[in-house]
C-alpha cells in the first residue's frame, strides 16, 4: 500500500468521524442527506462481500468493517434515533436515488471486469459511489447555508477521492498489469462532482465568511 492510498483512507475515515461527531454531539442531522448515507451503506455492503472469504491484511479487514458499521450506524441514527431524526431535512432531501441505484446496477451488469456475482457487485459499488454524493450536494444547494461540520465532511470526502486518483496514477506507473479502469473513470466523475462545492468552500475560507451555495 502506497502513501497516497493510505492518505485517501485516512481522509475518508476523518470524513466519517466528522459526520458521527456532528450527529452525536449536536443530536442533529440537519444538512445531511439520508439518501446519500443510504447509498454509501449500499456501496460498502456490496463492495465488501469478500470480507469473510478473501483475507488481504488486518488493516484491510478493519477498514472494511469500520466503513460498513459506521455507514449503517449513521443511517440508523437518521431514521430511528428519537432526537436526531427530528432534525432531518426531509423536504429538501428529495433526490430520486432509486433511479441512480437501478442505473448503476445495470452498468455493473454490462461493464465489469469479470462476470461473477462478486465482480458485478464490485463494479456496481464503484459506479454507485461515484454519484452517491449527488443527493447531499442537491440538499446543500437547496438549503443555501452550510454549517462548518457538514462542509468539512464533504471536503474530506472529496479529498479522499482526489487522493485515490493520485494513488491509481502512481500504481499505473509502478505496477505491472494495473487495469482498474472502472475505478479510475468513476473516480474522475466523482471528483468532478465536487468541483463546484470546492470552489465555494475555498471562497468561504479565503474571505472568512459562512459557506453559502447558490440556489
Swiss-Prot record:
UniProt GO molecular function: ER retention sequence binding
One GO BP: protein transport
Predominant cellular place of this UniProt entry's protein: endoplasmic reticulum
Pfam families (UniProt xref): ER_lumen_recept (PF00810)
Compartmental location: Endoplasmic reticulum membrane
Residue intervals passing through the bilayer: 3-21, 36-53, 62-82, 99-112, 120-139, 152-170, 182-202
Gene Ontology CC: one annotated term: Golgi apparatus
Lumenal side: 1-2, 54-61, 113-119, 171-181
Cytoplasmic membrane side: 22-35, 83-98, 140-151, 203-215
Biological role: Required for the retention of luminal endoplasmic reticulum proteins. Determines the specificity of the luminal ER protein retention system. Also required for normal vesicular traffic through the Golgi. This receptor recognizes H-D-E-L.
UniProt record similarity statement: Belongs to the ERD2 family.
Full protein name: ER lumen protein-retaining receptor A
Organism: Arabidopsis thaliana (Mouse-ear cress)
